[in-house]
């Protein structure tokens, strides 16, 4: 007989299930978090590890009662980090939707611009952050995630830009200016409940420049609108400028792109006229067979130059943003982005003080209705047994550990800023403790599960029914094991591997991405620790 299990999202654990003893309140008492020796440490030398949840969109601006209850609930579970994620999302009407609430959004979209804070939303955001800090829960702050650029923002081209648009925020100068403005306003605003700005608060673990973005990422049709046409043209123009800088003339480019009499440069393509096509991206860096068809749309020569260009654009943008955040006074590690898998893409994000990645197994990728995933039977829809089948995204196998490990870089701390498994039991129920154990083996620094809840209220989601597969607040497989997971990971109860395997990339390796690229991550992190090493000068490796 099936029986419903009731798990309320805002009721604190009590008795032996109260894991608040794992926390050391208030957050920040050991000083600012630092990146050193490849890991996160507090200022007083204490090793820092973090396990917690994302709270997305409208969940960032709860009313005071909800903030009090959720902080108490999280602390009782042993949660010591919350990622305040996508607080910049546009307003949505439907309760529980992945959007900001109309009553108190962080950004005042109703004013016709995304450049102003809504006073009520900012006050709620401040209060929530203060209550989390009070309980010993640290903060992961991200900047641009879901922002919808409005025409009133003074955009360079007519119209705005859709929410969650990718790639162009790394290219367009006006978008970059607006990101810096938002960073300054958010990070330097003094929270009246703590007396500190986020930039000065040791309760902040890291500041993430953007979410799931890269100069070589595609939009999967999300940029097809007429208002995005000049942004698409800007990327092509930048690529052609890069080719001219490298080759000087079309003839030199043609010579470089010719092999065995086959030229990859079309007769109509000329970098001086800005007509050389780039590579269309996707969720991840697209694959490229180095022995593939030479004049294919993603042939080896075109691909190699576009990856070199993408690395240049990523590093230029992230170095600039990181310098600006430090100029504002940041004292904690700054991370570039996440959801990165290809070798060139990972290398292009290594200017951050730590590395992060997102990793999912059995991700539904279902159609969105009213800006959220509310579907019947999503777990049944996506269930794949990882013991018998591993799906692939480009060159990457999508088991949690193998996909996450693609972005680990030697000498950098590492966290999963989003991860989850969405299939049915029995493998769903084992995925979470298993991940915590392997994270210990590989000596990772943080695991932030996506997503605890999507609501600004503590009492408007059912305790005994899963309506949104992405909200785990009442998922028995997650919640019933969480305290044990917290003990395992935060205490390091699984020993770190005795040996570490370095996976080496030369600069030439970054110009291609064969299908077997991710093969090392399907094996090494399960038996030992592994890190990626990128050689900046020559091919000599001193291990």
Residue map of PLM features:
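Active-site mouth of glycoside hydrolases
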Residues: 27-323, 327-352
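Short acidic/polar alpha-helix capping motifs at helix-coil junctions
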Residues: 2-4, 283-288, 399-402
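Catalytic-core region of carbohydrate-active enzymes that cleave or remodel glycosidic bonds
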Residues: 132, 188, 314-336, 341-364, ...
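N-terminal pre-domain segments of enzymes
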Residues: 1-30
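Short N-terminal signal/transit or membrane-insertion segments
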Residues: 11-19, 139-147, 276-290, 374-393
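Short, charged, surface-exposed secondary-structure boundary motifs
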Residues: 364-371
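Generic structural signal of hydrophobic/aromatic residues within well-ordered alpha-helices
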Residues: 19, 239, 243, 253, ...
